[in-house]
């Protein structure tokens, strides 16, 4: 009888643990959109930094369909790691669901994971892929430490994107 009681207790414990795990998974933030869907590079946002590398705001440029394809091809060659301890310093891409846009590009497999990184407080129909070497930012008394998808050697990637989109030239024009 004791052995039967232990088996029942074990089964009850396993079921209870499974129920707790299911409840935790249910509260985990889920992406709004299907990760296997088709996305586009809608715009490239890039940081306008002050003389002391203080955040002044960001600018954006709208890539042509050809430039967007070139950008996605560039990204596939970079090592990607998840990071939660730094903010981007220079630029990020906005990826929007193509159902709202006319230009469509297929999201690379490695990039599909990036759309799971989202802010549950801001459930807009887009996901930011953050690129570049980063640092913590303090603005208006708040420290910004959101998770983002970091690209190794972000400065090199910035230079390659600059060759496509002429980001530095645009920033210089705006500063003049």
Language model: regions and residue ranges:
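Short, Lys/Arg-rich N-terminal segment immediately upstream of the first membrane anchor
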Residues: 1-5
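Function-determining sites in protein domains
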Residues: 6-11, 20-176
């Amino acid at each position: 009888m004791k052995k039967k009681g232990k088996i029942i207790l074990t089964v009850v414990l396993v079921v209870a643990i499974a129920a707790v795990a299911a409840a935790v998974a249910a509260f985990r933030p889920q992406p709004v959109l299907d990760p296997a869907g088709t996305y586009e590079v809608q715009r490239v946002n890039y940081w306008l930094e002050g003389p002391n590398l203080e955040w002044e705001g960001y600018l954006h440029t709208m890539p042509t369909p050809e430039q967007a394809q070139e950008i996605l091809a560039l990204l596939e060659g970079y090592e990607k790691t998840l990071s939660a301890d730094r903010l981007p310093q220079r630029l990020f891409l906005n990826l929007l669901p193509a159902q709202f846009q006319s230009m469509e590009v297929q999201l690379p497999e490695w990039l599909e994971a990036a759309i799971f990184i989202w802010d549950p407080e801001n459930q807009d129909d887009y996901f930011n892929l953050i690129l570049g070497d980063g640092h913590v930012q303090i603005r208006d008394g708040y420290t910004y430490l959101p998770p983002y998808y970091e690209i190794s050697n972000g400065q090199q990637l910035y230079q390659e994107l600059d060759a496509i989109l002429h980001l530095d030239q645009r920033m210089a024009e705006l500063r003049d």
